[in-house]
């Protein structure tokens, strides 16, 4: 009997903590899936070459501490969490921080170099979307044991689920994979990715998720690494890559509408980051930037992950005027602007 009383008190305490943790926030939880745009450190302890838990990554983050974020500071989803009223960030699910009541504000399952296409993650030792979904199921079981089935159902249905993927599928797979190039046009490959996307949303829906936001592809042809690898010596944005991004994003928006019509109660928003990001690149001074082609880290042409390190020659002293932190990822300053766009476009996920 005494054991039952202690157990019952612990459940009551955790339920109270659940409501306390989300009291200042407008939604009970934030749950993230996808790639390096939203990864906050899940790759840190993997046998993967794609990591960022070392300086100069994180040099402008809290306590100048590298966490595994592919940025000099905060990601767009970090700013989004702040805007939504969270006092801390949902932890990386594979980190030590993802313990006890910390996961009651959500969790982050994203893994750098993953994509809609599971094979994209294999060469890099990253966590595929399929595996991220299995971790999410384990997360749901843990939360349900902690706060009870009814409260857990509220958390999953009212919490916002964010998905960011697709860039790695194109830049780190399709464009450099001769077999995929031979078998599929960019349009056909986009259809393959969107079938995986639809299946992923279907699975989330069956697991109780009702508020989901998916981040579009950025102007891929304007990433410094893309210009270096695919620009044929030209220093301008690679037009064909940007055209592929536009094509994919159009299909993504159409697919989200079809999925919403098919699933009762589903709120699904396709966040358009392409145009806001392109506006920053094409009108830098209007947004407080002066460098759009060269990234801050190293030579600014290709460095990312282990190539962007404390010994990288040429790393800028102050990244606030740079659009790109490394060859693939924006600076904290850009992430803050993009987070405002996400918030504005995602009102339907909040109300």
From Swiss-Prot:
The protein's Enzyme Commission number: 3.1.1.-
Keyword field: Glycoprotein, Hydrolase, Lipid degradation, Lipid metabolism, Secreted, Signal
Record has Glycoprotein as a keyword: yes
GO CC list: extracellular region
GO MF annotation terms: hydrolase activity, acting on ester bonds
Localization (cell): Secreted
Signal peptide residues on this chain, from the entry's feature table: 1-24
InterPro entries in the record: GDSL, GDSL_lipolytic_enzyme, SGNH_hydro_sf, SGNH_plant_lipase-like
BP GO terms, sorted: lipid catabolic process
Keyword Secreted set for record: yes
One Pfam match: Lipase_GDSL
Glycosylation sites per record: 234, 254, 318
Active site positions, chain numbering: 36 (nucleophile), 326, 329
Family that this chain belongs to: Belongs to the 'GDSL' lipolytic enzyme family.
Protein name, as recorded: GDSL esterase/lipase At3g53100
């Amino acid at each position: 009997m005494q054991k039952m009383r202690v157990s019952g008190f612990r459940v009551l305490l955790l339920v109270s903590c659940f409501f306390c943790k989300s009291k200042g926030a407008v939604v009970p939880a934030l749950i993230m899936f996808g790639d390096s745009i939203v990864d906050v450190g899940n790759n840190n302890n993997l046998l993967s070459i794609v990591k960022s838990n070392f300086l100069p990554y994180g040099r402008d983050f809290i306590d100048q501490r590298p966490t595994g974020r592919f940025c000099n500071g905060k990601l767009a989803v970090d700013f989004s969490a702040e805007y939504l009223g969270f006092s801390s960030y949902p932890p990386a699910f594979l980190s030590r921080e993802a313990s006890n009541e910390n996961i009651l504000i959500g969790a982050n399952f994203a893994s750098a170099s993953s994509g809609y296409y599971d094979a994209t993650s294999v060469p890099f030792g990253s966590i595929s979307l399929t595996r991220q979904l299995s971790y999410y199921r384990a997360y749901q079981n843990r939360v349900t044991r902690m706060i009870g089935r009814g409260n857990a159902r509220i958390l999953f249905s009212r919490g916002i689920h964010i998905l960011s993927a697709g860039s790695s599928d194109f830049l780190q797979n399709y464009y450099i994979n001769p077999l995929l190039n031979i078998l599929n046009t960019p349009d056909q490959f986009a259809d393959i990715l969107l079938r995986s996307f639809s299946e992923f949303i279907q699975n989330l829906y069956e697991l109780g998720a009702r508020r989901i936001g998916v981040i579009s592809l950025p102007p891929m042809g304007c990433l410094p690494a893309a210009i270096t690898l695919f620009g044929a010596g030209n220093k301008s944005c690679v037009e064909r890559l940007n055209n592929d991004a536009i094509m994919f994003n159009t299909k993504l928006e159409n697919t989200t509408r079809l999925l919403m019509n098919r699933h009762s109660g589903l709120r699904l928003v396709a966040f358009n980051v392409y145009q806001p990001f392109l506006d920053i690149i094409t009108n830098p001074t209007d947004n407080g930037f002066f460098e759009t082609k060269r990234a801050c880290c190293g030579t600014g042409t290709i460095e990312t992950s282990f190539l962007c390190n404390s010994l990288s020659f040429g790393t800028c002293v102050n990244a606030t005027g740079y659009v790109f932190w490394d060859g693939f990822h924006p600076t904290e300053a850009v992430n803050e602007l993009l987070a405002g766009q996400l918030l504005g476009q995602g009102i339907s996920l909040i109300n």
